[in-house]
Amino acid sequence: MRCPFCGGPDTQVKDSRPSEDSSAIRRRRVCPDCGGRFTTFERVQLRELVVLKRSGKRVPFDRDKLQRSIDVALRKRTVDPERVERLVSGITRRLESGGEGEVTSEAIGEAVMEGLKGLDDVAYVRFASVYKNFREAQDFQDLLGTLGGRLAGEALLPEEEEAVPVATDEAAAAPRRGRPSRKRA
């Protein structure tokens, strides 16, 4: 394998072991020319997949592009990288073992949304807003409704108001825990 640092034609494998989920082989390499060290991953590719885009164009499936799109949705979220790798590997395996040599970009997008929904709700909403091309706030509200949580500021229905406990004078006078609120001038 060519060295990514100096372009040297030969590198030596110093360590080789399976990845955490055993879906790849992790190899630690060193370049004898420049001494640069780097890691490579070797994965099984069941079949060559072709992605049929919305425009009708056909492009080869790119696992790295799938990884990047998930990483963008997860930016600044605290999700274990191993869980992300398992998600990407799982989606790739599902697509490759699907029996078809051609897969639509919609099928890939739906698989990513399904995976992100179980991984991180914020990343799910971020990805969905781009994938489904949200244009207005109502699109977000509709999607958030599918997550099952009440939206902030959403009005209660009359029958729900009765179920909400009313604060007593003691509870209202009790000191609040946590950080004090900061008043703005």
UniProtKB/Swiss-Prot annotation:
One of its GO terms (molecular function) is DNA binding. It comes from the Bacteria. Residues 164-175 have a biased composition (Low complexity). A zinc finger (unnamed) spans 3-34. Residues 49-139 form the ATP-cone domain. It holds the Pfam family Zn_ribbon_NrdR. Binds 1 zinc ion. InterPro entries: ATP-cone_dom (IPR005144), NrdR-like_N (IPR055173), RNR_NrdR-like (IPR003796). Coiled coil: none annotated. Negatively regulates transcription of bacterial ribonucleotide reductase nrd genes and operons by binding to NrdR-boxes. This is Transcriptional repressor NrdR. It comes from Methylorubrum populi (strain ATCC BAA-705 / NCIMB 13946 / BJ001). The lineage of its organism: Bacteria, Pseudomonadati, Pseudomonadota, Alphaproteobacteria, Hyphomicrobiales. The gene is nrdR.
